[in-house]
Amino acid sequence: MAQIPARGDCSRQLTRKQAGDAWEAAARRWLESKGLRFIAANVRERGGEIDLIMRDGKTTVFVEVRYRRSGLYGGAAASVTRSKQHKLLHTARLWLARQNGSFDTVDCRFDVLAFTGNEIEWFRDAFNDHS
């Protein structure tokens, strides 16, 4: 298993952007250790950004990475609101179109990798375009 940054290593001494980049890099390493292949990071399309795009076999996986210091207020996973899900779906739709694909032609899913303190939770298929 990939080494997870210790509490404070990413979030206290670094800027918010640097901390986000560090957690996304940790997420990428962790997912690669689970057999997923890296496709892209920080993919920006009009109206949104996808943290990681990975491949799990033939499935394209859009990954939202979240970090919270503690589980108060629901922890990291709870911060992926319905509004955020819609933005991710929209961004993925645009990215797929640039790849000459769509939700109808490409097997894909949306995962959330949530770091709460030093704990990792991997929510496979956390939501979809039918949610």
Curated annotation (Swiss-Prot):
InterPro entries: Restrct_endonuc-II-like, tRNA_endonuc-like_dom_sf, UPF0102_YraN-like. It comes from the Bacteria. Signal peptide: none annotated. Pfam families: UPF0102. This is UPF0102 protein YraN. GO terms for molecular function: nucleic acid binding. Belongs to the UPF0102 family.
